[in-house]
């Protein structure tokens, strides 16, 4: 995993002073690293009979679509308000500096479907806990929440359900 970890670059003071941003675009741009990441994550879920992979805006779309392709599943997008064209279900959640909202199509997940939720980085867990609630409210059965990377020191894993969390890399 070190070869994947080492290709991710740190961007100091982004998006604001005092934050060290983990920039995964370097990994995405390297074909062999991107393939390895997708293969390693997909291998974990082979045999799980995943029906849908939920990708969280925006980098989660990349990971979610690639995993869905490998697993023979459909892709569901969770987006910021006003970006999805049909009827949506919305969830507002707390941030350390206010609130934010996400939306999903109301017909994107059927009751009992097995769902894998994918995003690039697990930080505080606020966004992902909202997505988990949305999927459950639509009747989806969550197999796991998977991430390319986890910022362990922020404790986001504690906000997520039943230990159903997997991160390929931990910082």
UniProtKB/Swiss-Prot annotation:
Signal peptide positions (record): none
Pathway: Purine metabolism; AMP biosynthesis via salvage pathway; AMP from adenine: step 1/1
Cellular compartments annotated: Cytoplasm
Keywords for this protein: Cytoplasm, Glycosyltransferase, Purine salvage, Transferase
Record-linked InterPro entries: Ade_phspho_trans (IPR005764), PRibTrfase_dom (IPR000836), PRTase-like (IPR029057), UPRTase/APRTase (IPR050054)
One Gene Ontology term, aspect cellular component: cytoplasm
Gene Ontology MF annotations: adenine binding; adenine phosphoribosyltransferase activity; AMP binding
GO biological process: adenine salvage; AMP salvage; purine ribonucleoside salvage
Its EC number(s): 2.4.2.7
Catalytic activity: AMP + diphosphate = 5-phospho-alpha-D-ribose 1-diphosphate + adenine
Primary location: cytoplasm
SUPFAM superfamilies linked: PRTase-like (SSF53271)
Enzyme class: transferase
Family as reported in the entry's similarity comment: Belongs to the purine/pyrimidine phosphoribosyltransferase family.
Record function comment: Catalyzes a salvage reaction resulting in the formation of AMP, that is energically less costly than de novo synthesis.
Quaternary data: Homodimer.
Protein name (database record): Adenine phosphoribosyltransferase
Native organism: Geobacter metallireducens (strain ATCC 53774 / DSM 7210 / GS-15)
GN (gene name): apt
